Amino acid sequence: MAQRYPLESLLSVRHYREEEAARAMARAQSALKAARVAEAAKEKALIEWRKWREEEVERRYEALLGRSVPLKRIFEFNQGLSELNAQELDLAAALEKARCEVRRCEGEAARATAAASLARKNAAKIETHRSIWQQDAKREAERQEDLEFEEFKAPRKE
């Protein structure tokens, strides 16, 4: 009869921790991927907005050049340019925030990967111990069988 491994419950806990660490690593990788996509989208939006802003400023200057314009209109023009600059700063701040989120997610992913590696190593240690224990248990069972066989030898006929 095969004996039950005495550390079986510890082994199952280690496997559970290993699986949980793998799931946490997958979640961290997914969050990192999403953060990188968001960063790329914000960077693209900023680049496109800057291109549009240059065209818009040029269009606004063309509308003013060669005409007599009241001072109020020039003030409104300058105010409009300031608003465009403020919008650019908002987009640049959003991009920087997205980059910070990517760095944070990279750190989380690195920690999750390290935790998963540690969990795998811990489970492997118990697996190795179980393998050694099974070999020892098998040898002990064979030794017990040999002892029983020696005790059971038939008496000699003389």
Spans of model-derived segments:
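Charge-rich amphipathic alpha-helical interaction elements
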Residues: M1-E158
